[in-house]
Amino acid sequence: LLIDLVLVVIDGSTRDLGTATQLINELIIPSLGEKSNERILVAINQADVAMKGGNAWDRKLNSPTPESARFLNEKIASLKQRVFEATALAIEPIYYVAGYHDGKQQQRPYNLSKLLFLIVGHTPKNKRVILADSTLSTKTSTWLDDDRRSNYNQRTRDSLWEGIVDSIHNGAELGANIGLAFGSAGGAVG
C-alpha cells in the first residue's frame, strides 16, 4: 500500500463541516481503496473552543463541560452520518485538544492519549516499530487528561509491543528461510 494511514484533523472552532466532509468523501476515501475505514482517522482539534461561551470547557478538570460534550458529540454524529451517507463507510471521529502555552496561559492537552492509541492501532503492525522509536513527549501531563473510556496509555504500549513482537517473529522466520538455503544447519542458525 502506498498510504497506510490518513489522519484528517478538523478545526473544532469552525462551524463548516461541509468542506472537510466533502474532502473526506470525494478525495480521501476513494484514494484509500480497500479497507479504507481501517486506514482513516478523523479528529476534531481545539475541542476546548468548539463551543463558544464560558460554559464550553471545564478548565479545572481540563475536560468538556456536559453541555460542550453534547455539542462535540453532535458534531461527531453529524460527521459520521455525512460520511456514511456518501460512502457507506463507518468512521469513528474523536475530539481532542493539542494543548498550548503562550507564555501567559496554558491549556493542557486532552484526549491526545486516545489519538495516539488510534494512530498506533491503525498503523500496520510491521510499521509500529517506527512509532515506538519516535520521540514522543515524556511529559506525563501530555498524556494525562482524556475521556476515561479506556486506559489509552496502556493500550498504546500493548499495541506497540504487539508490533515489535510481530516484527521480531517475522524477522526470525525470514532469517530461518534464508538460512535454509545453506541446509538444515543454516536454517537453524538463520
Annotate each language-model stretch with its function.
Residues 1-166:
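Conserved GTPase G-domain substructure that encodes guanine base recognition and part of the catalytic core
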Residues 155-190:
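Membrane-inserting effector segments that mediate pore formation, membrane fusion
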